[in-house]
Amino acid sequence: MTRRRWLRRGLWLAAFGCLWINVCDDPPLRTDAYLLDVASDAAVVGLVTAAPSASQLTVRGADGAVVATAAEVEPVRRHQLRATGLQPGNSYRYEVVAGAERFAGVLRTPGSAPDAPVRFAALGDSGGQPWWVWLQRTPLWHWPARLGWLPDHGPVNAVGAELAAWKPDFVLHLGDVIYPKGQHAHYMSGFFRPFAAVLREAPVYAVLGNHDVMDAGGRQLLANLRTRESMAHDGGRNLSVVRGPVRIVIIDCNGSYGGRRYEAGHPTHAFLERELAAATEPWIVVASHFPMRSASRQRDRADLLLAMLPQLVEHGVGLYLSGHDHCYQRFGESGGDEPVMVVSGGGGKDLYEVRPDARAKALDPAFHWCAIEARDGRLQFEARAVGGRSIDAFEVKLPAGTALERIAAKNPARAQRIGQLR
C-alpha cells in the first residue's frame, strides 16, 4: 500500500513537472494596428495577425467622409496598408478590418511648410521582458501568454504610457528594441503591447541595436518596423526622416554590418556622407545605437570619434543621439563645433551606473525618455524621468560662425534656410 502511494505521488509530481518543460511553440506574434510611416500626403498602417487573413484600411476626415482606402486582398499575416491622397497638416481617423478583428487609431500628417513645427520623442534600450516570457513555451504558461492575460514589464509600460500621453508626431527609438536577441517571440511582450497606445497614433523609427541583430541579423526589426519602400534602400538599415526644418539620419553601426570598425569604405560611412552633403534642413540629428563618449559601462568608442565625428563637424550636425548605456548622459554644449552628444538608454531595461566624468554636462541613471520640439526657429530638448522629473534641458542652436561658413561654401541651399530661421 505504501509503495502504491509513493508511486502515485511520483506520477503526480512527474506530470506536474511536465507542465514546466519548454515543449510548446512560442505564441504567434500578433499586434494591434500601428503606424509604420506618415508623410504629408500618405501613411502606412501595419498589422500582424495570428493567422493569415485579408485586410481593409479606411481613412476618414474630420467630417467622417472616407478620404482613402487600401487593402491586402490575399490572406497574409504581415499587413502593410498604404493610404494616399491625404492633405498636409491634417488629422484623420483610420480603421483596419482583418477577418473578425477591428482596429482603430488616429494619424496626423505633418505640415508641408519648410519651417512646420515638429515634436518627437527619443529613447533607447526599452526591450526589457516580463518574468513569464521565459515560460511561455511551457504547457502551464503558454495559453495565458498567448491570450495576453499576463502583465508586461513595469518600467517599459510606464515609458510607453508617458509617450502616448505626450502625443509626439513620431518616436525615434535608439536601438535594442527587444532583449535578449531581437526575436519575434519577444516583440509582443517587449514592444507592441507596452507601446500600443503610442503606436496607434505615431510611427516609431528605430535604430538597429546590438541586441536587435543577435538573431538573423536584425531581420525581425526590419520586418516589424520598416515599410516595404524603405527596405529598397540599404536594406532598411540606414534611412532619413525629414520633418519641417529637421532631418534625422538613422544609421546602423553594428559590427555585423560592414565590419567592426566604422571608417571610410564602411557602407554606413558612405550613406551618412551622402545624406549630410545633400541635406538642406537647418537642423540635422544623427542617431546611432552606440555612444561616442560614455561615462558608464560602454566607454568611449574610438572608431566613431576618429571617423564619424569629423563628418558631423564638417557638416554642422547639431545633435548626436545614441543608446546602449542604460542611463542618461550628455556631453557638450550647443553652439560649438562638435554636436551635443546624448546617450538615452533608459527606456525600460535594467539601469546602468554612471561614474563622474569632467566632460559630462548631465548624468542620471534613471528610466526616462526625451522630448524634442522644433518651433518658431528654436529646437528644444528635454530629458524626462518616468514620473515627470526633468533630468536635463537645452536648446540645439543653429550653426553659426565658422560652422555656417563651411556650410555656405558646400551647401548654399541649407545655409539659406538657416538664415531664414534666424
Protein language model features and the residues they cover:
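N-terminal Sec-pathway targeting helices
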Residues: 1-14
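Proline/serine/threonine-rich low-complexity linkers at boundaries of modular beta-sandwich domains
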Residues: 20-28
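Binuclear metal-dependent phosphoesterase catalytic core
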Residues: 29-42, 46-48, 55-56, 241, ...
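N-terminal active-site segment of His-dependent metallophosphoesterases
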Residues: 30-56, 61-63, 71-78, 87-185
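Extended active-site neighborhood of metal-dependent phosphoesterases/phosphodiesterases
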Residues: 34, 70, 83, 91-114, ...
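Short, solvent-exposed loop/turn elements at domain surfaces
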Residues: 44, 54-56, 128-134, 214, ...
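Residue-level marker for buried hydrophobic side chains located in beta-strands
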Residues: 120-122, 171-173, 206-207, 286, ...
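Active-site glycine-centered loops adjacent to acidic/histidine catalytic or metal-binding residues
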Residues: 125, 175-176, 209-210, 251, ...
